[in-house]
Regions:
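Phosphate-coordination loops involved in phosphoryl transfer and adenosine-cofactor binding
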Residues: 2, 136-139, 220
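Glycine-rich NAD(P)-binding loop of Rossmann-like domains
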Residues: 119-151
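N-terminal glycine-/charge-rich "phosphate-binding" loop or analogous flexible N-terminal tail
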Residues: 1-46
Length: 313
């Protein structure tokens, strides 16, 4: 029986059918089969799995896997799942970087131009202009300087914002004030008018934005979280908003998704809730990237470079 490529995850039959069609068109020499339709023999023989926010147990039920290709940039659900070294390939895609950078810029403008205040005033039928704050007078701090963070930094700089960036390890980027480590993070936070979280979720970044680090931000600063929910301690964020130390938070990711109806974030006047839409996967672009990785594997027998299991990205 010819080996198949497993497709694991997807949000229901409609998305599964869409992904299957686009991926199959990009890889005409491969036979992709959704996990739920695979026979026992196909599950035992599959060497490659393409995953979209999968149930880790389903991926672990493919004992012959040689490597796993994610259609998302984040792979935290898979790191540590397997009892053997297994390359996990996160999606590194120029189109995803472009759309994420676009979202960072859009919601930075939303905060810089006081849109939350004007929306509140409209509900109160209050006509009250606010002083204009130039982009050149606004400091944006980026938590994370990988492919997505670097693209966002470039877009913000081009728009005139002063950008500072933090990463776990030393990095340099032309025109960006960069820092790393615990000291570098605290040094950056004190300058931020807007803090953007775009860092992978790992054991080290879980709870990274806590009460102490929120307190280190400039009074009146705002927060954008486009990374993963657990990077920000929700209770600490709400306390900082309630005290007035933070002016607003734009949240696209949460500890539990979809965000439960009973969450206090829904009704909080200083929170904008988004349904995880900041960096959507463009399937045509992603399929081309995945197809190139798979062709290389078929030619060389070597899987692509995976995430560092110790770092989680």
């Amino acid at each position: 029986m010819a080996e198949v490529v497993a497709l694991v995850g997807c949000k229901g039959p409609a998305q599964e059918a869409e992904y299957l069609q686009i991926l199959s068109a990009a890889m005409p020499g491969e036979r992709l089969v959704p996990f739920r339709r695979m026979t026992d023999a196909e599950r035992a023989g599959a060497q490659v799995a393409i995953v979209a926010n999968p149930d880790p147990a389903e991926v672990a039920a493919l004992p012959g896997l040689v490597w796993v290709q994610s259609l998302w940039a984040g792979v935290e659900k898979l790191v540590g799942v397997f009892d053997r070294p297994l390359p996990i390939i996160r999606l590194v895609d120029r189109e995803m970087a472009r759309t994420m950078a676009e979202a960072v810029l859009a919601w930075t403008y939303y905060l810089q131009r006081d849109m939350p205040a004007y929306a509140s005033q409209q509900r109160e039928r209050l006509w009250q202009p606010h002083p204009y704050r130039k982009s050149t007078d606004t400091t944006v701090g980026l938590l994370g300087l990988g492919a997505l963070g670097s693209a966002a930094a470039e877009r913000l700089t081009d728009a005139g914002f002063f950008v500072r960036a933090w990463s776990r390890t030393p990095k340099t980027l032309t025109g960006i004030d960069t820092g790393h480590g615990a000291d570098g993070l605290l040094a950056m936070l004190g300058h931020c008018d807007i803090l953007v979280c775009i860092v992978p979720l790992t054991p080290e970044t879980r709870g990274l934005v806590n009460a102490a680090r929120l307190a280190a931000l400039k009074p009146g600063a705002a927060l954008i979280n486009f990374a993963r929910g657990p990077i920000v301690v929700t209770e600490d964020l709400i306390a900082a908003l309630d005290s007035g130390h933070l002016s607003h938070a734009v949240l696209d990711v949460f500890d539990v998704e979809p965000l439960p109806a009973q969450s206090p974030l829904w009704a909080h006047p200083a929170v904008t809730v988004l349904p995880h839409i900041s960096g959507p996967t463009d399937m045509d672009s992603a399929a081309a990237t995945v197809a190139a990785n798979l062709r290389e594997y078929r030619t060389t027998g070597q899987p692509p470079q995976g995430v560092d299991a110790g770092r989680g990205y």
